[in-house]
């Protein structure tokens, strides 16, 4: 879950105001084998994360749903890692009775992504930051944010899925 949380925080550019987690335990009492984590943000956005070491399929997929387009990144797929869907919802003006939402379907684009070793890129970025003095994309502050979310998720699990609110002064530090 740490990587999923880190990606969500990076994509959304904010720390959640509340975290809720529910877990299912099958094999070892007190240790969830499957966890569903929900992060709620003050902007009204949400992130849903599902992790399970029991799952028979290796899944590393991120789905981003926007008002105009949607994107699916599949880290396991070696040929079509990213798909962008021109799909959205159009809201009517509601000036007449019976109007409803209409779904808009368009093209699917699959941009070319050069295949390079992620760990090598991460190490090279770190070295480049040391040499240039620039701040890395993922720094100690990001690590602390991820740990706060993980801790809130653990507290929520222990409280039966009750949302845990992150204190505002911690979210902005």
List each language-model region with its residue ranges:
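A structural signal for well-ordered alpha-helical scaffolds and beta->alpha junctions
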Residues: 1-5, 75-76, 119-123, 150
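NAD(P)-dinucleotide binding in Rossmann-like oxidoreductases
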Residues: 25-30, 42-121, 168
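C-terminal helix-rich "cap/oligomerization" subdomain common to oxidoreductases
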Residues: 42, 121, 125-173
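Oxidoreductase and adenylate-handling cofactor-binding alpha/beta cores
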Residues: 1-26, 38-45
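Short secondary-structure junction motifs
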Residues: 16, 59, 159-161
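Short, small/polar residue-rich loop motifs at catalytic or cofactor-binding pockets
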Residues: 33
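Aromatic-acidic/polar surface patches that form glycan- and anion
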Residues: 1, 30, 115-119, 136-143
